[in-house]
């Protein structure tokens, strides 16, 4: 799976970078988590700082175009992102961490 960054837009007010990227894959469309891990490795970031919002694969193509938000640290991601996006990306919210520890 090869990831090419198409566009990066800085958003300093929300402490993040909006990234549009293209994934070329050999098999079926890769999972959101595998794309997140690969994108994080490409950008030299921690996987919890990357939130994949959209993956779009055209029928019959081996190319997926996606949109992600890359935060400066995981705390900003938890503060800004909606709960369902955190769940999709397997990022644990603050309240859930305390519940799991108990």
Curated annotation (Swiss-Prot):
Q: Does the keyword DNA-binding apply?
A: no
Q: What is this protein called?
A: Small ribosomal subunit protein eS24
A Gene Ontology biological process noted in the UniProt record is: translation
Record-stated family: Belongs to the eukaryotic ribosomal protein eS24 family.
- Which keywords are on file for this protein? Ribonucleoprotein, Ribosomal protein
Report the superkingdom from the record. Archaea
Provide the disulphide bond pattern: none
What's the gene? rps24e
Q: GO MF terms on file?
A: structural constituent of ribosome
